[in-house]
């Protein structure tokens, strides 16, 4: 029964359609289609129970574990272009209904879309006409995948389809139907005449202001793509016609165990995070502190001895200059005692 459940789950995952949203500048040309290479990562595997392992199991499971997951390559075709990214959920929900009770209805809509693609007898002609355009665009098109957090995703987009979000990062200039923007010097000259134009020709002044503002602002649109199963195109014949976009599958992948290292069973292991053995470090720190204290005490003693030696030297020098009687008076005034006091104390 477990095998049946796993196979049904895998089938549901494989049947999930692929939707790609491309964010691009308005001046960048629209791509009719492109190759999407999905690097699927291995699913997370539960922790092995070593008590249930055997030699036969290791021989059977060895090749499957070592098997690499091959990338999946599909051709996606343009479906719709919008100017607001907030409509993503509405677009996805319009394509795929989430209610299990309306599965038949949503399936019927999907079949209708297939029939519409089949009725398009000019699809091959359109692809042929756009070969040159796509070759030029594919040479300049560069894409980057946008990683977004799936936590708190109330729309449930990833439950309905494999959704990939990418952005065009190429610097392609508008080629088809491109407007001729004036140079910076011409814009400065026109700006100086705007006050006069507002009085004489208000409409021309408005058009010039709009052109100047549009040249400094960058507007974005969002193109939606999906896999068209009815497009019978071989990879060899169209690999140069359409660019390649490489993405990473955002489904659950093997990025380490969900549980942290603090939850491992062998809590007495030396490499366990909770297990800390600070005895050796503490002993080394105490020895360093003792050495520092000894060094400080020795320095204080040496300084005190140096001061006493200097004081005795100065006393002898003063005594030799003043004499014994005058030195006693000097010592009493300076040091607060006389030579007789020292003799009495001794």
From Swiss-Prot:
Protein's name in the database: RNA-directed DNA methylation 4
Task performed by this protein: Probable regulatory factor for several RNA polymerases. Effector involved in facilitation of Pol V transcription as RNA scaffold and recruitment of silencing complex to target genomic sites.
Organism: Arabidopsis thaliana
Entry-linked Pfam families: Iwr1
GO process terms (BP): post-embryonic development; regulation of DNA-templated transcription; regulatory ncRNA-mediated gene silencing
Coiled-coil region(s): none
Region feature Disordered, mapped onto this chain: 253-346
Assembly and interaction partners: Interacts with NRPD1. Associates with Pol II and Pol V complexes.
Regions of compositional bias (Acidic residues) in chain numbering: 253-268, 278-312, 323-332
PANTHER family with a match to the protein in the record: ALPHA/BETA-HYDROLASES SUPERFAMILY PROTEIN, RNA-DIRECTED DNA METHYLATION 4
């Amino acid at each position: 029964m477990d095998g049946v459940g796993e196979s049904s789950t895998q089938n549901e995952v494989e049947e999930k359609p692929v939707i790609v949203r491309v964010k691009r500048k308005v001046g960048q040309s629209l791509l009719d289609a492109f190759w999407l290479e999905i690097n699927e990562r291995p699913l997370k595997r539960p922790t092995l129970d070593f008590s249930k392992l055997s030699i036969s199991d290791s021989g059977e499971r060895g090749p499957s574990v070592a098997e690499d997951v091959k990338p999946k390559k599909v051709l996606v075709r343009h479906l719709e272009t919008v100017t607001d990214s907030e409509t993503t959920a509405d677009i996805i929900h319009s394509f795929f209904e989430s209610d299990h009770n309306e599965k038949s209805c949503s399936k019927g809509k999907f079949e209708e879309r297939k029939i519409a693609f089949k009725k398009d007898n000019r699809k091959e002609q359109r692809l042929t006409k756009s070969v040159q355009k796509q070759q030029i665009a594919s040479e300049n098109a560069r894409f980057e995948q946008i990683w977004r957090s799936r936590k708190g995703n109330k729309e449930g987009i990833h439950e309905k389809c494999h959704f990939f979000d990418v952005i065009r990062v190429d610097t392609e200039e508008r080629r088809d139907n491109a407007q001729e923007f004036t140079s910076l010097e011409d814009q400065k000259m026109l700006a100086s005449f705007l006050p006069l134009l507002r009085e004489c020709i208000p409409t021309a002044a408005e058009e010039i202001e709009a052109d100047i503002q549009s040249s400094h602002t960058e507007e974005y649109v969002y193109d939606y793509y999906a896999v068209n199963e009815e497009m019978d195109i071989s990879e060899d014949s169209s690999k140069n016609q359409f660019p390649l976009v490489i993405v990473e599958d955002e489904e659950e992948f093997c990025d380490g165990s969900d549980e942290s290292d603090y939850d491992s069973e062998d809590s007495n292991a030396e490499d366990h995070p909770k297990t800390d053995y600070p005895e050796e470090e503490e002993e080394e720190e105490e020895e360093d502190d003792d050495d520092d204290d000894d060094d400080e005490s020795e320095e204080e003693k040496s300084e005190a001895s140096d001061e006493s030696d200097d004081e005795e030297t100065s006393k002898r020098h003063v005594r030799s200059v003043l004499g014994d009687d005058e030195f006693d008076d000097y010592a009493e005034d300076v040091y607060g005692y006389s030579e007789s006091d020292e003799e009495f104390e001794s």
